[in-house]
Design a protein with these regions (language model features):
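Short beta-strand-to-loop acidic/aromatic patch adjacent to the donor-nucleotide binding site
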Residues: 73-86
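Conserved catalytic core of nucleotide-sugar-dependent glycosyltransferases
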Residues: 68, 86-167
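Conserved glycosyltransferase catalytic-site signature
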Residues: 60-65, 82-83, 90, 147-152, ...
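Active-site-proximal specificity loops/subdomain of glycosyltransferases
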Residues: 29-70
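C-terminal catalytic/acceptor-binding lobe
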Residues: 146, 168-252
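Short, Asp-centered acidic motifs that coordinate Mg2+ and/or phosphate
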Residues: 75, 103-104, 190
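Short, well-formed alpha-helical segments that are part of the catalytic scaffolds
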Residues: 1-11
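Short beta-strand/loop segment that forms part of the nucleotide-sugar
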Residues: 15-27, 49-53
Length: 252
């Protein structure tokens, strides 16, 4: 999946800076993914950050904040590695932010706009070899609900101003809901592109499942936060150690 999404972005948006963060005991991307990506596209605009770690929990919120600190553009896209969108959806989202219509855009529809793709190796090869012809996925895709996961395009300053990603959410569960809620509570202009998103099916560890050990902690934190008004949210985020640390990193 990371081969597909990274190659797709570099191919369709050759001037965009793509930053990828990998946290593992050793780098799989460098030796397994990167050589394949280089067969299809230039990687001059790709930055790969590797962090060696024995941590068993996928700390998505921390990684997203790491990526924000590493970025240097006025607009960023928090992009999951297992999805791609039609090219014009990215362009519509970018234009909405550049023209001031939105502070953040979810560039896919809410409802039944997800194409879940049974992504076998033959389908993978056909999609890349066809220069990303979406019709090659027709026999492998089926409709599933879509809401607010998978990422958003956002003004970098807006992400900082609202407190960035809440690093108290660890592993999977509720962090996307909380971020959307917070953007709305702080009065930011949240836009939407009504279009499809292609989600490539993959194996799941406990980090992507309701049974992960952190799921209830995340759920309980979200149930508490969702009852707060904007003033309470501001007070909470101003007291977070991670937020102070990130603001210091951003000022360096």
């Amino acid at each position: 999946n990371v081969i597909t999404s990274t190659t797709y972005l570099l191919k369709n948006f050759p001037e965009a800076k793509v930053i990828l963060k990998e946290v593992d005991t050793r780098s799989h991307f460098k030796f397994r993914a990167l050589p394949t990506i280089k067969k299809y596209v230039s990687t001059d605009q790709l930055t790969h950050i590797f962090e060696e770690s024995e941590e068993k929990f996928f700390h998505k919120t921390r990684i997203l904040n790491d990526l924000l600190v590493a970025s240097d553009t006025s607009i960023v896209y928090n992009h999951d590695v297992d999805v791609v969108l039609p090219k014009d959806s990215y362009e519509l989202a970018y234009d909405a932010i550049k023209t001031g219509k939105s502070d953040v855009v979810y560039p896919f529809g809410a409802g039944v706009y997800q194409w879940a793709v049974n992504y076998s190796e033959p389908t993978f090869n056909q999609f890349l070899d066809s220069d990303f012809d979406f019709s090659t996925l027709d026999d492998a895709k089926f409709r599933v609900a879509s809401s607010i996961g998978w990422g958003q395009m956002i003004k970098r300053d807006t992400e900082v101003e609202v407190g960035m990603w809440n690093e108290n959410f660890i592993s999977w569960g509720a962090e996307d809901c909380e971020f959307y809620f917070r953007l709305s509570s702080f009065g930011r202009k949240v836009g939407r592109v009504i279009g499809d998103i292609y989600h490539f099916e993959h194996g799941r560890t406990f980090n992507s499942h309701y049974h992960n050990p952190k799921f209830m902690d995340n759920h309980n934190l979200w149930q508490e936060i969702r009852t707060w008004d904007a003033d309470k949210l501001i007070e909470y985020y101003q007291k977070q150690d991670y937020n102070a640390k990130r603001l210091e990193e951003l000022s360096c």
